[in-house]
């Protein structure tokens, strides 16, 4: 399969720069995986699509204000994007500068350039930085960092993004990108789902900046997925197994929940799923056999991205690309702050031949 098989034309004006005023007020395109039938509605329709006893699995990661601006102590502007917090004083980060800092180089960060950090080591594309500050890293970032909006939201971050670019249930700081399907759930909608008898469970996957990296190979089989840390605790495993046993469906909220659950299944050979606390590089594309999830709630993804490949593996390649082209015609809003899809699994998807239109 070629990366170019997963392209589609997207007018720039359909890229959402700001979210809807009301979280659950976005549009919802429902795609029936087996038939490819499509339905247009609003996100709160999700209540009618789920049954009592179904299980929604959310990602409870919380986005950290991971972007810092400043300069090298030797001169020259620098931009730091924290990829992973290692401990109270150290991080792994992407560093943009006219000349990459060498080990031992000092950085002066923050709007007032009063936060001191030292480049300790380089690990491929990432820099290990140590902060010389009495505060821990998360406190520093919360005080001085900027929200790391995706590159296609081509505007500076604003104070409002600190809450708007978070799910209402986020509780585990560590992500540099939001699990955006969850942005559409507000508390009244969650209450309605609970009142209906829909069950809920929470995994953690700290989304890294690699989620925005383009696929730089022609054949998708040659792509090496970025690594992200995921946790699927015992209570999630129990909830999934109980849901399956009673004949209900597991619905993943977002591709990060998909990757967490499927990683936990892939790592365990004795049962459907087992607890998982590890880095994952799972890459899901057409031909993949889904083991856990029955339905998926997700936003509209970038052309040629690993995420549209994941959706194609779930709903079927042709059904997915047809739905995306229809969404463009219907003027849906795309990407992180955009509209959503509800997709049921197409059991024939893994046998489908990918032939671009």
Swiss-Prot record:
Gene Ontology molecular function terms on file: S-adenosylmethionine:tRNA ribosyltransferase-isomerase activity
Enzyme class, UniProt record, top EC level: transferase
Single GO biological process annotation from the record: tRNA wobble guanine modification
Any one GO CC term of the record: cytoplasm
Catalysis performed (reactions): 7-aminomethyl-7-carbaguanosine(34) in tRNA + S-adenosyl-L-methionine = epoxyqueuosine(34) in tRNA + adenine + L-methionine + 2 H(+)
Pathway: tRNA modification; tRNA-queuosine biosynthesis
A Pfam family annotated for this UniProt entry: Queuosine_synth
Metal-binding as UniProt keyword: no
Main location: cytoplasm
Keyword vocabulary terms for this entry: Cytoplasm, Queuosine biosynthesis, S-adenosyl-L-methionine, Transferase
Function: Transfers and isomerizes the ribose moiety from AdoMet to the 7-aminomethyl group of 7-deazaguanine (preQ1-tRNA) to give epoxyqueuosine (oQ-tRNA).
Quaternary structure annotation from Swiss-Prot or TrEMBL: Monomer.
Family: Belongs to the QueA family.
Protein name: S-adenosylmethionine:tRNA ribosyltransferase-isomerase
């Amino acid at each position: 399969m070629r990366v170019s098989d997963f392209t589609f034309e997207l007018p720039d004006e359909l890229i959402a720069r700001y979210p809807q005023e009301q979280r659950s007020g976005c549009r919802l395109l429902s795609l029936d995986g087996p038939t490819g039938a499509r339905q247009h509605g609003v996100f709160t329709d999700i209540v009618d699509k789920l049954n009592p006893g179904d299980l929604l699995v959310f990602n409870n990661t919380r986005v950290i204000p991971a972007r810092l601006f400043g300069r090298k102590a030797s001169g020259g502007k620098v931009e730091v994007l924290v990829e992973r917090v290692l401990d109270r004083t150290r991080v792994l980060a992407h560093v943009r500068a006219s000349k990459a800092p060498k080990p031992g180089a000092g950085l002066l960060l923050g709007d007032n350039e009063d936060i001191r950090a030292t480049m300790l080591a380089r690990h491929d594309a990432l820099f290990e930085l140590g902060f010389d500050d009495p505060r821990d890293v998360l406190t520093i970032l919360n005080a001085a960092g900027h929200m790391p909006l995706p590159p296609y939201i081509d505007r500076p971050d604003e104070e409002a993004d600190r809450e708007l670019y978070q799910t209402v249930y986020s509780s585990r700081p560590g992500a540099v990108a939001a699990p955006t399907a969850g942005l559409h759930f507000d508390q009244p909608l969650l209450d309605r789902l609970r009142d209906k008898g829909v069950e809920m469970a929470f995994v953690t996957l700290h989304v890294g900046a690699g989620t925005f990296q383009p696929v730089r190979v022609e054949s998708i089989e040659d792509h090496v997925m970025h690594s992200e840390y995921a946790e699927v605790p015992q209570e999630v495993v129990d909830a999934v197994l109980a849901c399956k046993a009673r004949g209900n469906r597991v619905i993943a909220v977002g591709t990060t929940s998909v990757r967490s659950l499927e990683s936990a299944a892939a790592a365990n050979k004795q049962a459907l799923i087992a607890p998982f606390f590890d880095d994952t590089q799972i890459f899901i594309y057409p031909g993949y056999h889904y083991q856990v999830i029955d339905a998926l709630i997700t936003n509209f993804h970038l052309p040629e991205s690993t995420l549209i490949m994941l959706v194609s593996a779930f709903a079927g390649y042709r059904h997915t690309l047809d739905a995306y082209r229809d969404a463009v015609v219907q003027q849906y809003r795309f990407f992180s702050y955009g509209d959503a899809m509800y997709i049921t699994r197409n059991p024939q998807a893994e046998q489908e031949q990918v032939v671009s239109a």
